[in-house]
C-alpha cells in the first residue's frame, strides 16, 4: 500500500515529539510520501519521499516567475540533521507571521489565507511527484482551512486515489466566542469552504463522537472516531500510593488551563491545613507571569518543576500517583477545545498513574474518560475539593483507577488495534475505488 500524506507541518520527530503520524504509522506495513506546507525539514524513520510548499515560496510566486513547490530529501549529513532538529518555523516569513499572530491573530491569518489562495503552485513539479509515487490512498490529517482545501483539491485533480481526512479540532462551526467581526467573517468563509471541500473525502476520522455525528448529518460524509495508540504490552503492575499523594501536571498552561490548576491548588490548601497529605507538581517549559507564580505556589502545595524531556517524564509518572488532564472552564476556551482530544490522554493511560480529569462535561476527552470509567472526573470547580478529599481518605482508589486507566488503554488503544482500524478503512476504500473503475 502506498500512502500519500498531505499535512500543514513537516514530519519531524525532533520538532513535534510524539506526533500522531509517528504514533500511528511506526511499524505500519506501507510506503509513505508527504506533501507539506511549512519551511522545516523532515526527520523521522517512516517516510522517505517529500514535496514541500512553504509560505516564502508562495509569496515569491506572487511577484516573480518562480512558482511554489519542490521535492525535498530527508537530511543525511550532520549539518542538515542539526538544521532539521531546530524549529524552522521560527525563522523567515513563517516565523514572522507566527509572532505577529500573537498580537493580531485574525488579520494575520486572513493575510495568510490570501497568500495561499492566490499564490501559484508549480503544478508540473507536483504532478511529476504524484505520478512518480502513484499513491493508493491520500490521507489528510488537518485543521481544515483555505490553504489546505485548495491544495487538497489540486492533488485530487492529479490522482484518482481515495481521499481520507482526520481532524482533531473544531474546523468551522459557529460554536465559538469572539468579539472580532473579522473572526466571524473568516469563520463564515471557512464554514462555507468546508461544505465545498468535504465532498472530496470518502471518509472523515475525528476524535469527537459529537463532531462525527455533526459532520455526517450536515455534510453527508461517512465518519468514525480515531485515537492515538499507546504501549500497553506489559501486564499492569500495581504500585503503592505515596505519602503525600502526588499529583502531576505536565504540559502547557495556555487557554487558561493554569486557572484550573489554581483551583486544584486552592483545594489542596484546604486538605493540607493539618499536614501535607497531597501535593501537585507542575512540569512546563512556559515562563510564568507574576499572577501565575503567586497563585501556583508552595503555599498551596503546588510546586513548579520546569520542563522535562519525554524520557524524564516517564520517570516522573513512575514516581507519581495521579496524572492530571485539565482544561479551562471559561466559555470561550470551553468551546474552543470542545472537540479536542489531547493526545496526552493515551500517554496518561499508559503512565501507571490514575487520571484526574477536570474539564467541561461536553469536552470530548472528558466524555471519553467518563464513559469508560477510566478517570476521576470533575466538571465543576466546586467539586474539586470533595473529589480530592475522597481520594485522600481512600488512597486505594488511586490504585483502582490507575488499573482502570491502563485496562481502558489496553482494550482500545494498542498499536495493533489502532493500526488495524486505519488499515481496514484504507483497504476498504481502495477496494471500492477499484470496483468502480
Regions found by a protein language model. Name each.
Residues 379-382, 386, 395-427:
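A charged, aromatic-enriched C-terminal amphipathic alpha-helix characteristic of glycosyltransferases
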Residues 39, 192, 196-223, 366, ...:
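A short, active-site helix/loop in glycosyltransferases that binds the activated sugar's phosphate group
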Residues 1-83, 223, 231, 269-271, ...:
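N-terminal subdomain of nucleotide-sugar transferases
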Residues 121-124, 128, 150, 154-158, ...:
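Membrane-proximal helix-turn-helix segments that form the acceptor-binding/catalytic region
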Residues 231-234, 240-295, 303-311:
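Conserved catalytic-core segment of nucleotide-activated headgroup transferases in glycan assembly
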Residues 256-259, 313, 323-349, 355-367:
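Nucleotide-sugar-dependent
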Amino acid at each position: 500500500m502506498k500512502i500519500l500524506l498531505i499535512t500543514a507541518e513537516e514530519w519531524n520527530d525532533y520538532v513535534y515529539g510524539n506526533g500522531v503520524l509517528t504514533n500511528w504509522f511506526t511499524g505500519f506495513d506501507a510506503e509513505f510520501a508527504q506533501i507539506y506546507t511549512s519551511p522545516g525539514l523532515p526527520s523521522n524513520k517512516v517516510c522517505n519521499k517529500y514535496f514541500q510548499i512553504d509560505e516564502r515560496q508562495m509569496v515569491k510566486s506572487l511577484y516573480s516567475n518562480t512558482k511554489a513547490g519542490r521535492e525535498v530529501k530527508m537530511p543525511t549529513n550532520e549539518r542538515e540533521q542539526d538544521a532539521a532538529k531546530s524549529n524552522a518555523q521560527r525563522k523567515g516569513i513563517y516565523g514572522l507571521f507566527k509572532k505577529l499572530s500573537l498580537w493580531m491573530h485574525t488579520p494575520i491569518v486572513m493575510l495568510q489565507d490570501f497568500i495561499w489562495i492566490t499564490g501559484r503552485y508549480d503544478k508540473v513539479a507536483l504532478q511529476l511527484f504524484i505520478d512518480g509515487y502513484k499513491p493508493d490512498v491520500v490521507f489528510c490529517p488537518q485543521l481544515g482551512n483555505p490553504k489546505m482545501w485548495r491544495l487538497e483539491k489540486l492533488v485530487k485533480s492529479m490522482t484518482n486515489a481515495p481521499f481520507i481526512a482526520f481532524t482533531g479540532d473544531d474546523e468551522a462551526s459557529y460554536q465559538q466566542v469572539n468579539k472580532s467581526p473579522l473572526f466571524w467573517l473568516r469563520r463564515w468563509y471557512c464554514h462555507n469552504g468546508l461544505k465545498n471541500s468535504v465532498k472530496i473525502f470518502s471518509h472523515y476520522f475525528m476524535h469527537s463522537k459529537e463532531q462525527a455525528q455533526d459532520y455526517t448529518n450536515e455534510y453527508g460524509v461517512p465518519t468514525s472516531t480515531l485515537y492515538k495508540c499507546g504501549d500497553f504490552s506489559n501486564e499492569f503492575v500495581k504500585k503503592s500510593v505515596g505519602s503525600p499523594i502526588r499529583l502531576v501536571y505536565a504540559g502547557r498552561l495556555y487557554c487558561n488551563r493554569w486557572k484550573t490548576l489554581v483551583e486544584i491548588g486552592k483545594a489542596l490548601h484546604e486538605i493540607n491545613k493539618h499536614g501535607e497529605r497531597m501535593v501537585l507538581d507542575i512540569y512546563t517549559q512556559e515562563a510564568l507571569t507574576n499572577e501565575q507564580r503567586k497563585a501556583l505556589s508552595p503555599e498551596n502545595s503546588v510546586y513548579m518543576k520546569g520542563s522535562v524531556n519525554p524520557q524524564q517524564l516517564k520517570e516522573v509518572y513512575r514516581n507519581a500517583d495521579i496524572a492530571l488532564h485539565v482544561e479551562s472552564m471559561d466559555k470561550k476556551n470551553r468551546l474552543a477545545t470542545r472537540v479536542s482530544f489531547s493526545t496526552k490522554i493515551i500517554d496518561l493511560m499508559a503512565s501507571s498513574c490514575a487520571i484526574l480529569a477536570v474539564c467541561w462535561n461536553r469536552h470530548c476527552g472528558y466524555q471519553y474518560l467518563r464513559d469508560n470509567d477510566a478517570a476521576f472526573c470533575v466538571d465543576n470547580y466546586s467539586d474539586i475539593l470533595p473529589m480530592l478529599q475522597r481520594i485522600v481518605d481512600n488512597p486505594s482508589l488511586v490504585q483502582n483507577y490507575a488499573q482502570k486507566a491502563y485496562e481502558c488503554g489496553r482494550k482500545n488503544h494498542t498499536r495493533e488495534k489502532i493500526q488495524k482500524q486505519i488499515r481496514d478503512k484504507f483497504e476498504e476504500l481502495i477496494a471500492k475505488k477499484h470496483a468502480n473503475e
